[in-house]
Regions:
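Conserved tyrosine-mediated DNA breakage-rejoining catalytic core shared by Y-recombinases
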Residues: 102-108, 162-230
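Short, polar N-cap/turn motifs at the start of nucleic acid-interacting alpha helices
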Residues: 167-175, 186, 272, 291-311
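N-terminal core-binding DNA-recognition domain of tyrosine site-specific recombinases/integrases
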Residues: 3-94, 99, 114, 136-141, ...
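Active-site/catalytic core of tyrosine-dependent DNA strand-transfer enzymes
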Residues: 123-126, 143, 191-198, 216-271
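Catalytic-site neighborhood detector that most strongly recognizes the C-terminal catalytic loop/helix
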Residues: 176-181, 193, 301-325
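C-terminal catalytic core of tyrosine-transesterase DNA break-rejoin enzymes
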Residues: 91, 148, 152-159, 256-263, ...
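Basic, Lys/Arg- and aromatic-enriched nucleic-acid-binding interface segment
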Residues: 58-72, 76-80, 91, 95-163, ...
Length: 330
């Protein structure tokens, strides 16, 4: 009953995440209890076990490290699942109160320090781009243009895979400043792709208003996109497409992009790199430019806030970002 309501009210990706933890963890550990047995003590003991659970991770040098199996954010997701189920029981008068409300807030373990975000320095960017321009695996995975586009736009991997030719304006839109008027090439970030169990790859328009945005493109990225565009493409075709069963271009799975990255990253000494590293690199380049406000950075990233700025109007273009990023990609 609870998961049915979630599917009706929330995005498929959220429902899929809840279903994963419900089937894989909550039901195996709590499913045999009757509702009247799901008291504060039982639920608290369940979350205590999750907090203490550890996993062994092999490091790059072959050594092993004990790490937390269920991070604080994961446990918060699981708590939302249990709370939702118990709230349904309250609404149907199966129990008198929701025991999850009596639990202490979930915190990270004592002494735990979140690893600092890692972006690509100028030297690492040059090394990576030089390699993917020549490597057969990287070329076959279309990584050369895709990585430049990712670093130059800051899009999430699902957004990268969802960009269509109709979302690009390579001729540019007119932007008026105090000094002049110029044409700024842009990408309109209007959708995202992600896999949903039982449905395959699905498309949605973003979970929040800030996810829908217009991002200026650096000149180097624009030049490479123009070279890809032959003029006969269907506007609804993805820019970084995969071949569909009928031979026509279709959306690429984000997991396939990650797989291509794993095949090349060790070759350039970047074994820790993921597609999200490119987004962090974009954010780092923007953060290094003191002329951009926190509001501008948040707009470009498609986030509610960037650093301290939260309660301001949103949605401007900020064309100067393209200039900073173009210099960083050269």
């Amino acid at each position: 009953m609870w998961i049915t309501k979630i599917k009706e009210r929330r995005e498929d990706s959220t429902a899929d995440t809840y279903r994963h933890w419900l089937d894989g963890l909550v039901l195996p550990q709590l499913g045999e209890l009757r509702l009247d047995e799901c008291d504060v003590a039982q639920i608290d003991a369940f979350f205590a076990r999750l907090e203490k659970a550890r996993r062994t991770v092999e490091d790059d040098d072959g050594s092993t490290t004990e790490k937390v199996r269920y991070a604080a954010n994961t446990r918060r997701t699981i708590r939302a699942i249990v709370a939702g189920i118990m709230q349904q029981a309250v609404l149907h008068q199966a129990v008198a109160a929701n025991p999850v409300r009596e639990l202490e807030r979930i915190e990270s373990p004592k002494g735990h320090r979140k690893a600092p975000p890692r972006g690509l320095t100028a030297e690492k960017r040059r090394r990576l781009l030089t390699f993917v321009d020549a490597d057969k695996v990287a070329v076959g995975g279309d990584l050369s243009d895709l990585i430049r586009f990712a670093i130059g736009s800051g899009l999430r991997v699902g957004e990268l895979c969802a960009v269509r030719w109709m979302d690009l304006n390579l001729d540019g839109i007119p932007v008026v400043t105090d000094a002049d008027m110029r044409l700024v090439p842009v990408v309109a970030v209007r959708q995202n792709v992600y896999p949903v169990k039982g449905k395959g790859l699905t498309v949605h328009g973003g979970k929040t208003a800030s996810a829908l945005r217009i991002v200026p493109l650096p000149q180097m990225v624009t030049t490479r996109l123009r070279a890809r565009h032959h003029g006969d493409e269907n506007p609804e075709w993805p820019v970084f497409a995969a071949a569909g069963r009928d031979g026509r271009p279709t959306y690429r799975w984000p997991s396939n992009v990650r797989r291509s990255v794993r095949r090349v990253r060790d070759e350039v000494g970047l074994g820790w790199m993921t597609p999200h590293t490119w987004r962090r690199t974009y954010a780092t380049i923007l953060d290094d430019e003191l002329s951009l406000t926190d509001r501008a950075k948040a707009d470009l990233m498609g986030q509610v806030k960037f650093l301290k700025d939260t309660y301001v109007s949103r949605g401007e273009l900020h064309p100067d970002a393209a200039v900073f990023l173009d210099a960083a990609l050269r």
